[in-house]
Amino acid sequence: MRLTFAMFVARLAGWTSHTLLGKSGETIAGRVLLVLCPNAISQLSVGRKIILVSATNGKTSTTRALAGFMSTAGSVTTSKSGSNLARGVASALMTKSEYAVLEVDELHLPFVVDATKPKAVLLLNLTRDQLHRMHEVKRVADRWKEMASKSDATFIADIDDPFLNYVLASASNNVRVSFGGMAGRHPDGAVCPSCGAYLDWVGGMYSCICGLTNQVSDKKFSAESAAMRNQILANITAEYFGVPWHEVDLSTLERKVSKKFINADCSIRLTKNPASWREALAGVEGEKVILILNSREVDGIDTSWLWDVDFSGLRGKHVVVTGERGLDLAYRLHVQGVLAELVPDFDSATAKFAGPVEVLAAYTAFFELVG
């Protein structure tokens, strides 16, 4: 009775938020549900096949692809907005279905695994994110390792990431996937997360005196990009449930939006941490670029991570910088020999251009621009 009442009020709150404020309504619905019925996630997970997806980067696009694959096997519930905290999970689970494919924030994953008792957990990568919230990568990996040791779920992960290999070592059921190494050394993988010794890296392959290595795996593939890796991992997860392999247009997995502002035809990419900046910068092909850096809570207040990103590929391009921490970014570019113009806002930035422009936007800026 309590759950039924809580769901009624939550749906009403979500409908009101969507109708009157134009928002998705998922977040407020989940928040209301958990206030009125704190164990709603556990109750709504009973009798369902739950699949969880977590990572530093690529969660939303991979979850979307995996949900599409699973829809050929039965009814599927997933978050439409990418809300990945406990409230987003709760909101998604209010829709009845045979399967639930849910994106989960890295810090919330242990709680959600315990509450939902998933059949499978897909882990894509684990790299440095917002230090004020996530702390160091090893700390998150330790929490995941403890979580995996207590769960009956099958954990599927890319073991070219040494932190995920470390996590899987404690899982009773796992599928270890390798793509023949990373594109270079893991940015946070100088030492072994298991024993603390230096990892021996040869290209993207690693080994340690304690035995941690990606040279031995359950499945081996080749992939040219992070998007392709994630598509393959999603297929492996779906295959675990008997779903046949799907081919996907990789361009649909990118969080990129095209939109016109005045005379500028903008291709807007989301950039939220060092790994996503590196990937986005590698994809910049044009000569006109706008970079936006904010520092609100979800963006990350500490911008020291800018020094972990190589911006040298922007040399010689027409670069305009804006955002709340635009000065920090402009200085970082200056030190690396990238000429950039600092302007007060996005309108001023787009006024500098006509035609195609590539925009790399921080989390809050991205969603303000795409609506």
Located regions from the model:
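Residue-level signal for inorganic ion chemistry
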Residues: 124, 156, 230, 234, ...
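Glycine/Thr-rich phosphate-binding loops of Rossmann-like dinucleotide-binding domains
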Residues: 110, 131-132, 165-166, 202, ...
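Short, compositionally biased "basic patch" segments
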Residues: 51-72, 249, 253-255, 276-281, ...
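Short, solvent-exposed loop/turn segments at secondary-structure boundaries
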Residues: 132-137, 236, 302-304
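ATP-dependent carboxylate-amine ligase
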Residues: 1-30, 46, 189-196, 210-212, ...
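Phosphate-binding loop of NTP-binding sites
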Residues: 2-178, 185-187
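Buried hydrophobic packing segments
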Residues: 66, 70, 89-93, 233-241, ...
